[in-house]
Amino acid sequence: MADNPKAPTFIKEGSGDLESQRRNEQVNREVGELVTRKSLSDQLRENSKKKRQQFQRQTKEKNSFTRVSNDDLDHINKVKLDELEKLRNFSQWAESEERNRRKQLQLLQQPSTPEHTNKQVISKNDPIPTSIKVRKLKTSNGAKNALGVISKPKHKKTDRTQKK
């Protein structure tokens, strides 16, 4: 009787048939359960709705403290682009070094004839050769084994320097 949400029914005076009263209450409970019982599709629909709402609550909670700001995203993207650029530069450098090495190997493998020695391979990165004058070392007569000393060339005295 405590389970029944309806108001309790009391036994009238004079009727002491408890078994018939129990049967009546049982029938009333079954009829009430039939009315309140939902179909399987309704139960599944409500269950999926509850699960979806629970999942949405969990994602809101997670996103509230794990979301990255736009500045942080920009910084992360910039770092990734810098790494890709460094990788590209390194691969280009490695390819150019490989080409230079192959050219040098080809030059070494070619027969050394006068025709081939006159030809020089000049690339944009090679320095332009210039002529350099090297002065002879001046050695003193007394110290032949000593290291040579480079001295400035002496200028011939002109009329102007003699007058002073």
Curated annotation (Swiss-Prot):
InterPro entries tied to this protein: FAM192A/Fyv6_N
Biased composition (Polar residues): 111-123
Sorted UniProt keywords: Chromosome, Nucleus, Telomere
Record-stated family: Belongs to the FYV6 family.
Cellular location(s): Nucleus; Chromosome, Telomere
Pfam family for this entry, one: FAM192A_Fyv6_N
UniProt-recorded name of the protein: Protein FYV6
Region (Disordered): 1-72, 95-164
Cellular component terms (Gene Ontology): chromosome, telomeric region; nucleus
Keyword Nucleus: yes
Superkingdom of origin organism: Eukaryota
Biased composition (Basic and acidic residues): 19-47, 58-72
Function per UniProt: Involved in telomere length regulation and promotes fully efficient non-homologous end-joining (NHEJ) by a mechanism activated in postdiauxic/stationary phase.
